[in-house]
From Swiss-Prot:
The protein, known as: CTP synthase
Annotated Glutamine amidotransferase type-1 domain residues: 294-532
Assembly and binders: Homotetramer.
Catalytic activity: UTP + L-glutamine + ATP + H2O = CTP + L-glutamate + ADP + phosphate + 2 H(+); L-glutamine + H2O = L-glutamate + NH4(+); UTP + NH4(+) + ATP = CTP + ADP + phosphate + 2 H(+)
One example of a Gene Ontology biological process annotation: pyrimidine nucleobase biosynthetic process
Bridged cysteine pairs (disulfide): none
Length: 539
């Protein structure tokens, strides 16, 4: 086989951080001059997360080729240089759809279609297709869910078969949780033992056990896990809870020397690992002595910490080159004291979303920021809120609205894109990377320092082309358009400290090592506003 595979499973509890672990391993392996590809196998029966409630699943991360994916792919992107595509994710829904389509087309020649071999063979095809497309040295495969879940069984069986076919080219990492009982002052290994027993009963013996824990594991505890789980003691690694930032994870794993173990096991020769640049970025990110800047997030799904995961991370990325310490203030658009909360912030970000709830609150936030000269950044639906607010209060069209919120509005300044009125919702939006031509002399141009960029999209509605001329006549600047049809991509509010809206999702391209330029300029504007307020108060 031309590539090696690392399979990552999780046990004991969910939310162990397998996605962060996989992303961190990718970074460490790339620092060994190896090409890495990544694949997430998700057991849920949805075809993709595109129609799932953000309160249940968190954000939907979009790839360049327009695939709606799990938020873990966002972690893969932010930590490493892996190329992500439709080959980087597969769900049970996709697998079963493919199998049933083949059955309807007669490809199984009348055989009784079963989980084994038909479903498991399709999963193996997915693994092979990812490797064939990305051509990596090492493929990291994260299996979603927890050992013991019935939904995961076909994926684990496929992994077992794949390992049997390629025993020298595969390695299994099992991630578990090792609880600490404060009352007894003891670390308990029994849950890990049972989880490994479950995995071995399926036919997969882990090569590595990675233990999440609140407290460091002693040599004695590692020896006990080694004995009862049938792995060498030096193959038991510890990932203690991170206190400052998720970006410490690669440093923690490097300290455990896990990448050297993996490389030796897979037949590679480890090289000295230099993470000094990453260490510097983490230290800068966690430096609380820098100037404090408060950013208000006026969003619909703030109760779920992962609903705007990429937005949160992009803001923190930008705080490093902006040299400030960021405080993110969640503000519910329905709050009675919305404007009071905004008045205490140095900047406002209005992220994307769908549906009528919270819409008017976002428009109120946009108006307040425009009139009070507070830096404001609108993304996707947030940009549409900026445009509708401008039409209502500057163009004097009080009934202006988006057709998503009111299909009968007399002034539909935001309308549905042509061909988007499909009854089928899954995967039918304008998705993926599209070009955007930047207007010279604009805030966007100052940020990007180029006249053509590629950004990722996920939307059905656009600024109504028939209103653009009137909006521009009243001062709104169209700072970016898609050359493929002249769709409005970026708007800016003139004579303002910094107010900009984008139809795309710049957060999907941001990394700690390469923050997105629009986020950097937004945070710099908020920092300047914070300094201005502080100087005014000291007079």
């Amino acid at each position: 086989m031309s590539f090696k595979s690392i399979f990552l499973t999780g046990g004991v509890v969910s939310s162990l951080g397998k996605g962060l672990t996989a992303a961190s391993l990718a970074l460490l392996l790339e620092r060994q001059d190896l090409k890495v590809a990544m694949l997430k196998l998700d057991p849920y029966l949805n075809v993709d997360p595109g129609t799932m409630n953000p309160y249940e699943h968190g954000e939907v991360y979009v790839t360049d080729d327009g695939v709606e994916t799990d938020l873990d792919l966002g972690h893969y992107h932010r930590f490493s240089s892996v190329q992500l595509s439709k080959y980087s994710i597969a769900t049970s829904g996709q697998i079963y759809t493919k199998v049933l389509t083949k059955e309807r087309n007669g490809e199984f020649l009348g055989s009784t279609v079963q989980v084994i071999p038909h479903v498991t063979n399709e999963i193996i095809n997915v693994i092979q297709s990812c490797a064939d497309h990305h051509k990596p040295d090492i493929l990291i495969v994260e299996i979603g869910g927890t050992i013991g879940d019935i939904e995961s069984l076909p994926f684990l069986e496929a992994v077992r078969q794949f390992r049997c076919e390629h025993p020298q080219d595969c390695l299994s990492i099992h991630m578990t949780y090792v609880p600490y009982l404060r009352a007894a002052k003891e670390i308990k290994t029994k849950p890990t033992q049972h989880s490994v027993q479950n995995l071995r009963s399926i036919g997969i013996s882990p090569d590595v056990i990675l233990c999440r824990s609140e407290a460091p594991l002693s040599t004695e505890v590692k020896r006990k896990i080694s004995l009862f789980c049938n792995v060498p003691e030096h193959a038991v690694f510890n990932a203690i809870d991170l206190e400052r930032s998720i970006y410490e994870m690669p440093l923690l794993l490097a300290k455990e020397n896990i990448s050297d173990f993996l490389l030796n096991k897979l037949g590679f020769s480890p090289k000295p690992l230099d993470l000094s640049d990453w260490q510097d970025l983490v230290e800068a990110l966690c430096d609380k002595e820098r100037q404090h800047v408060r950013i208000g997030l006026v969003g619909k799904y703030l109760e779920h910490k992962d609903a705007y995961k990429s937005v949160f991370e992009a803001l923190f990325h930008a705080s490093v080159p902006a040299n400030c310490s960021l405080e993110l203030v969640p503000i519910a658009p329905e709050s009675e004291d919305l404007l009071e909360q905004l008045s205490q912030c140095d900047g406002c970000l209005i992220p994307g979303g769908f549906g009528t709830r919270s819409w008017e609150g976002k428009i109120s936030a946009a108006r307040y920021c425009r009139e009070q000269n507070i830096p404001c950044f609108g993304i996707c639906l947030g940009m549409q809120a900026l445009v509708v607010e401008y039409a209502r209060n500057v163009l004097d069209k009080p009934l202006a609205n988006s057709m998503e919120m009111n299909p009968e509005t007399p002034d539909p300044v935001v309308c549905m894109m042509e061909g988007q009125d499909s009854v089928v919702k899954g995967g039918t939006m304008r998705l993926g990377a599209y070009p955007c031509r930047i207007a010279p002399g604009s805030l966007a141009s100052a940020a990007y320092k180029t006249d053509l960029v590629q950004e990722r999209h996920r939307h059905r509605y656009e600024v109504n082309p028939s209103y653009i001329e009137r909006l521009e006549e009243h001062g709104l600047k169209i700072a970016g358009v898609c050359p493929l049809g002249e769709l409005c991509e970026i708007v800016e509010i003139p004579n303002h400290r910094w107010m900009l809206g984008v139809q795309f999702h710049p957060e999907f391209l941001s990394k700690l090592a390469k923050p997105h330029p629009l986020f950097i300029e937004f945070i710099r504007a908020a920092k300047a506003y914070s300094l201005e307020k502080a100087n005014h108060e000291h007079r």
